[in-house]
Amino acid sequence: MINYKYDFIPAGDQGIHIVFPEQIDISENQIIQELAHQIQSEFNYEITDVVPAYRTLTINFDIRKTTYYEFCLKLKNFLSHYVSDKKHNQGRTFEIPVCYDSEFGIDLEDVAAFGNLSVKELIKLHSKNNYFIYMMGFLPGFTFMGNVPDQIAMPRLSVPRSSIAPGSVAIAGKQAGMYPVDSPGGWRILGRTPITLYTPSRPLPPFQAGDWVKFYQIDRAEYSAIKELDAHGEYQLKIISG
């Protein structure tokens, strides 16, 4: 039984959006992540893709095997008998090294001023938090995470930058993220991780929606050393739970 209200909305002629309450909520999103796995398993023959997001679950089905109305009835029946698997909700926690050097953290001063903090205090606050991955998207391997502490939840730039370096660690309001490739972007950049977040030769990132990220501070020497190891495939991401 699901304790959240939800609606079904058509997504083209071969898709369904299951839409949950409009909020950024970890418990709600964990239900969405779990449903994605269970629906993928239960209806594997009829569906082609399942895409979880902040508050929606999009299911694409094979129109040769079912119709929108038939599949809606099946989903309603499935959801009415849904039982949570708490083990799946736990996720894994990854430790991500971040260099907060001023060359990398180009918005550190502004975000510190926004939060009435010193840069040192900002780094401590940012790195002590655990960030939940709500969804992957926008770019291959881009992590949409929350929840950024209110004190430093500075809105995104009014005018996006034309280029953000790969590995940039950023915030935008209550959201946190890591840029996997060079890209335009309007989020506030606090630092940079030396690890490769996406490469075409390894298209699947090590973490996924439902996991957690814990940042920890490194200096420039450590950044260079880890980057060298990572370039040769010798750096192992630390998983501290899950």
Say what each PLM segment does.
Residues 1-242:
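Glycine-rich active-site loops that engage anionic ligands at enzyme catalytic sites
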